[in-house]
């Protein structure tokens, strides 16, 4: 028998279960493999004397602990559980360790220092010591080491006052105790040691307690990063303290209070309480359990009992869990990406920083193998460029681990050249370059010297010879190719002479050479650019893009070759003729920007050549340069306006609180915080932040930081979020943040807006106050505070890593972009300025949101009022902008108007802004132009008439067509704006006069007030009349114009008396309007507005109307409006409603419409008193009004050239002929809403037929009369006839509508013999007048024309035959189409486009699935994908036995043939034997050579189902669905995402679910239900016994006889049942479906010829695979639906298909 040596390491491995249990009791876990590695390698390499075989010596253990507990990156937190367990075995040894403990050593006497020596205090690895200023003192220890230090429950805690006894006289051997063994050695003097010891069992098994010292707590806090900065490091420190010291509840609180802030401590405790386990081990929500396990107040735990220590151990574990939970930060991969390798940083150091970033900013552990891929990618792409490029080029990079990459990176790093080597290399390269250049220069100088020496001789030799010719791209100076001499960089240049042209917009240096003359400076996109005028250039050229480039390119041919250059996008160019949009060529190689012929044409430039050179002028001969001056006078442009600045400085000094420049951000102290009310149904909206360009982000970042510093913004966490949009300020590079609050505005309650209307705001400004002060409040909305409950509504995302911001910000003040902000601020400012208005009643203060206008009668009053206003604003917390202030001036700009001497003008800036608008190119730009110009319509006479051609282009859905008319209107508006006059301010103390004129449906007027003997214009008014009023006679149109303009003028007059002056005496017309033209509602409205005697007066008619600006004829055109309206007739002057005495015909008309059998039927009739003149049915759905119109129109048409009296009982038809017809015609057959009137075609036909009779009288008679009068008899007969006609067959539509409006004459139709045969069958009658055959009121169309019509109709619509039939029946064609249904079917079936696109309509009967004859013989297999994949498992391989339905499912990480073969050989074959048949789809894993080879070797018949036909694998596909659905339900129930763990439960369910025959797969296989234990049954003795083997075999035999054999017979019976096959046979032409179609690609391809067929699939030519019958459709009609023009079956030229004896061959033949 051999003997083995037992070491401490082998001893622990032999008792490993006890070692692991001891570690678990201490709250840690240890691993056996790592235990061996640490003992044999890691701790040995620490060089502290640790032996390879291990030791239980406390000295060695303490030395290892110092290394492991070292602070910062030098420690080893992962090794703390292992060394702690070693110490536990040494200090509290079990029985199998005691024989191996080292003998106790006598303590070495401590030497006494002769004199106090100053020494720097040293800190331990875990418990650093504070330096002390007191003299060294010996440690306070009890005299007897065996005596207890402290009784935890009876004695007071330390420190204790102790004396300084003499040192021990000699060594003595003390009795070792656990406390003494735990005293750690210090590297400093013993007098300066600070001990912090854990709670341990001392003598007599009493717990001894030493609290933490102040120095330990201080050093832990000062030598470790705070929790917010590095939570991982601090958590590891606290974990080591909890493990090694085992502190009490009070010590834990003291430790948390010292190392964490209040907020962090609260978060840790909250996270810890969430992890308190319940009875089932899961986190509980019971408050009593939580308070008992993790109390917030000091508990009454007795640490001398096991229960108390167990409470404390669980408390420490929960505290660690809380620390880790609170340490989790939101994932911020952007912070990880910012960790890049430094220039001189080693790859190892960089990797450590990268891992630390992963721990700090992500919840992922970089040491986790699952995260290795992301860490590797970050390590590669964030390395320095040289290392990154070489790592990316490594072969087989996907197989490298992180350690492999680190080694490669270290190799690359070590091979780097040093800075000295790099400098040496660059110096050598520069030296070689200089040598080469010097050599070339030497050759050049030698050549020059030689040429100068022999100049005369060479000239004589050369004679008349020319110089050496240069290349087309060769420089004549340096002889290099690629440029010309004028662009040669080596050519010396003369200093440019001083230019007399100053380019104010040049953004380059002051000494830059301008382009040569002639040159012009234009503004491109707001930036000035100086161009060289080049008439030879077809297009203008820019050398700098200054914006995005388009994808359009142009080939530029130059002297040195040709090259493609890109165009810029459309830029706005300011020309002398206005602003246009233009696209430039971007040619960076061009020396100067070129002004080509394209822009010169738009500029209308003129070039004059004089003795001084070329001169470029504008269209009127004026120079195009704006400013020319000498350079020595340039300084005058920058001289400050000293007077105005000094005055402003005085105001800033006297009122510092009123200005934003001196008072800072204001706050309205008198206003309560604004509370926003949400709608009742509002829910939070969260919209992600849009991607923001870097330039824009940098532009708004200073503004965000400024508002954060001012407290306008603050960080928050809100369920609301809206995006932030950076908007670039025009003409600058600055951006301002604008928040998109549209979604928030939708969810906020609307309030009534009380903001003043700028249209009439200045009406309250009296002309008697000519001194003005204008103040613009700065950041006005930010002066109002926002309630804390409403602040979260306006949150937005913002990230600023430089200041540590990553999250949401929100506004603490009223934000801009909120829909109610203007109203809320306007009301708040009004209330704050109410006291000012009361104190200064003589002043006029106008307020438009944040724009204030103060008007006074004198300058003194204006100064005093301005001072008081500034003081009020400053006291209330508002701030005005000193930059925009206009103080005590007689001419100011307010709301875009210039105010002076009681008048207002349009500002020059506003005119220039409108004049610079380029020609619109879409509807949106037209609306923008009309909106901008419409703001100035008060200054433009007849603006509505000028802009009339532009308004139709603004309607949605209208095709944008910019023509000459629109261009003229566009230019006329700009011209009218240039000549806009000055308008007087409305004086509400004086009466107003309104001159009105109307022309072609446009109302124009001038509102004036008297100024001495003159009439001063106040406003020019214009508007277009509505559609109804536009159709009235001129006098009534004038009434409508007066009503519209009086309403608009009321906004300016504010209810003051108004006198109306027109050229029509309309007052009598208003008082007695005609009933024929006006409705009662409109008549009442006009009278209520215009007959207000207190406000509206009608003046005398005038002959000079300022509205038209044209003199009227002398004396005017005086007329009586009532008389003119009375003389206004309808379309026919002699039309009357009285019977004609000499009438040739007296007829009665009527139309009937009613619903019968769910369908509306209609008819019309014309009769006399006793006989029917005409009657016809009308199309289904015809209304009664339409029928009346048709009947009356037919009567007028038949009475052509005769005197007719016609009676109708329709008010609608009677009013149309006498009144409304003329009104409809005048207004363009439009309703008052601008829509087309109903029955438009019938009304037009009726108005045209009114002129056919010689004389006409249309009389209205009551309907359904009783009596014997002629009118009653005729009306009853017409009514009965119309009803009778409606009940006749109405499949043939009436021809009246098309006959009433005759189109162009067509040539007569020619009927062939087949058409005449059809005519005879239909018994149609011939119409000799038109030369056509008529059938049921319809004209029979020849068949060839009918087929052509249907063919063209199908080509236009590509509708189906049924749809086209419905379309033809609904339309009133008036034609009978012979064989319509046949032609419709033929055309649709022969359309190739429809065949390639339309879906097939092949229906099949129920299929029969082939199954196995017994279990295990026939399987189906398939892969299914399940996301999200857990632990790399993303696929599930499913096998199903087709006989029993038994399923097997295996998780897989990859969908490969290797997985299929592995599971087939290792799982299916050992359990169920070799399958006979295996079915699957055409997936790559199944058609792979590996899978097929395995099946061939095992003798398995592997059947591949049809492609793109999941039904072929229906059984396994249905099982996939069942498994997925059950997994989804279980994950919802359990809350677990690990579907692999839940898979056994799913398989149990599907194996015990009854199938079609009521049996479960388990019962089919085993003959009984699965065994189940009733856990709630007290008697379980019945489950303890099991049947014998013979009983099992007998049961299986019964299963085979009673279940499996009948089941196989049932399957066989289904297979033998005949199935109706598909209708395709060999030789047919079919279309084949494309399963993956591209955009606008046909759905079907072909046609193909069928070669072979099976009951379910086909083989066609040109396609290798078999195709399922559901994936094809017939390419032409079947045999029973052959086209009439197709060749017959006996056609000798037709191919025939015959079968042969060989089933794989067919015979094709054709007769000759």
From Swiss-Prot:
A zinc finger (HHCC-type) spans 1354-1394. It comes from the Viruses. Residues 100-119, 136-146, 156-171 have a biased composition (Pro residues). Residues 1141-1287 form the RNase H type-1 domain. The active site is at residue 534. Residues 416-434, 1276-1287 have a biased composition (Basic and acidic residues). Residues 529-599 form the Peptidase A2 domain. Mg(2+) 1 binds at residues 776, 850-851. Residues 1411-1569 form the Integrase catalytic domain. Residues 497-512 have a biased composition (Polar residues). The RT polymerase active site binds 2 magnesium ions. Binds 1 magnesium ion for ribonuclease H (RNase H) activity. Keywords: Aspartyl protease, Capsid protein, DNA integration, DNA recombination, DNA-binding, DNA-directed DNA polymerase, Endonuclease, Host cell membrane, Host cytoplasm, Host endosome, Host membrane, Host-virus interaction, Hydrolase, Lipoprotein, Magnesium, Membrane, Metal-binding, Multifunctional enzyme, Myristate, Nuclease, Nucleotidyltransferase, Phosphoprotein, Protease, RNA-binding, RNA-directed DNA polymerase, Transferase, Viral genome integration, Viral matrix protein, Viral nucleoprotein, Virion, Virus entry into host cell, Zinc, Zinc-finger. Mg(2+) 3 binds at residues 1422, 1481. GO terms for molecular function: aspartic-type endopeptidase activity; DNA binding; DNA-directed DNA polymerase activity; RNA binding; RNA-directed DNA polymerase activity; RNA-DNA hybrid ribonuclease activity; structural constituent of virion; zinc ion binding. Its cofactor is Mg(2+). GO terms for cellular component: host cell late endosome membrane; host cell plasma membrane; host multivesicular body; membrane; viral nucleocapsid. The record marks 127-128, 197-198, 445-446, 502-503, 627-628, 1297-1298 as: Cleavage. CDD domains: RNase_HI_RT_Bel, RP_RTVL_H_like, RT_ZFREV_like. A lipid is attached at residue 2 (N-myristoyl glycine). A zinc finger (CCHC-type) spans 473-490. It catalyses: DNA(n) + a 2'-deoxyribonucleoside 5'-triphosphate = DNA(n+1) + diphosphate; Endonucleolytic cleavage to 5'-phosphomonoester. Residues 708-899 form the Reverse transcriptase domain. PANTHER family: GAG_P30 DOMAIN-CONTAINING PROTEIN. This is Gag-Pol polyprotein. The lineage of its organism: Viruses, Riboviria, Pararnavirae, Artverviricota, Revtraviricetes.
